Amino acid sequence: MAMFEQMRANVGKLLKGIDRYNPENLATLERYVETQAKENAYDLEANLAVLKLYQFNPAFFQTTVTAQILLKALTNLPHTDFTLCKCMIDQAHQEERPIRQILYLGDLLETCHFQAFWQALDENMDLLEGITGFEDSVRKFICHVVGITYQHIDRWLLAEMLGDLTDSQLKVWMSKYGWSADESGQIFICSQEESIKPKNIVEKIDFDSVSSIMASSQ
């Protein structure tokens, strides 16, 4: 993480002003993407700058770097980073391997086909070469979805959704999110009633606002 923090400061300076779109900075930005992948760090602004430079300078396009950017964006679901990055890649490059495979994985995650995602990932594990912490980051997203969707879930189903975890691995994630299991194999996620927090909305309308509306309507 020390290397990432050091590079982050330097990259931050590069991204200011007109220098942001200077193709001479691409090599530095591409190394920064690789550092993010290795150190399980993330900088969306810098990654979008790389994709924008590829748009302006198609001859400099790097498939491997783009793949790393997409995979890092997936680790930040449910935020819309993946969609933002995808929209900056032209259709021809989207059809290339491994970008095509990563876009498919992203589609499976965004549509919550989690079991199919793990199966597809298992068939393309080479995609994760040099990417630290990818699978656990995805599991955090899946746990987020489970937490807002279920009150109870079968133990076997949760294990499948998280990538066929062993019982001991599953217990680690249950402990992390405060989920408990009963003897029947059901996992208690949360009470939806407890998670609903009513909001009191108070809107103040002063006389000046009302009088101006009345005047304009006459």
Curated annotation (Swiss-Prot):
Q: What is this protein for, i.e. what is its function?
A: Component of the eukaryotic translation initiation factor 3 (eIF-3) complex, which is required for several steps in the initiation of protein synthesis. The eIF-3 complex associates with the 40S ribosome and facilitates the recruitment of eIF-1, eIF-1A, eIF-2:GTP:methionyl-tRNAi and eIF-5 to form the 43S pre-initiation complex (43S PIC). The eIF-3 complex stimulates mRNA recruitment to the 43S PIC and scanning of the mRNA for AUG recognition.
User: What family classification does the UniProt entry report for this protein?
Assistant: Belongs to the eIF-3 subunit K family.
User: Which Gene3D superfamilies does the annotation name?
Assistant: ARM repeat, domain 1, Winged helix-like DNA-binding domain superfamily/Winged helix DNA-binding domain
Which segments constitute the PCI domain? 42-204
Keywords from the UniProt entry: Acetylation, Cytoplasm, Initiation factor, Nucleus, Phosphoprotein, Protein biosynthesis
What cellular-component terms does GO give this entry? cytosol; eukaryotic 43S preinitiation complex; eukaryotic 48S preinitiation complex; eukaryotic translation initiation factor 3 complex; nucleus
Coiled coil (UniProt feature):
none
Instruction: Cite a single Pfam family from the UniProt record.
Output: CSN8_PSD8_EIF3K
Q: Which BP terms in the Gene Ontology apply to this protein?
A: formation of cytoplasmic translation initiation complex; regulation of translational initiation; translational initiation
InterPro entries found in the cross-reference section: ARM-type_fold (IPR016024), CSN8_PSD8_EIF3K (IPR033464), eIF3k (IPR009374), PCI_dom (IPR000717), Transl_init_fac_sub12_N_euk (IPR016020), WH-like_DNA-bd_sf (IPR036388), WH_DNA-bd_sf (IPR036390)
Name this protein carries in UniProt: Eukaryotic translation initiation factor 3 subunit K
- Summarize the subunit comment: Component of the eukaryotic translation initiation factor 3 (eIF-3) complex, which is composed of 13 subunits: EIF3A, EIF3B, EIF3C, EIF3D, EIF3E, EIF3F, EIF3G, EIF3H, EIF3I, EIF3J, EIF3K, EIF3L and EIF3M. The eIF-3 complex appears to include 3 stable modules: module A is composed of EIF3A, EIF3B, EIF3G and EIF3I; module B is composed of EIF3F, EIF3H, and EIF3M; and module C is composed of EIF3C, EIF3D, EIF3E, EIF3K and EIF3L. EIF3C of module C binds EIF3B of module A and EIF3H of module B, thereby linking the three modules. EIF3J is a labile subunit that binds to the eIF-3 complex via EIF3B.
Regions that span the bilayer: none
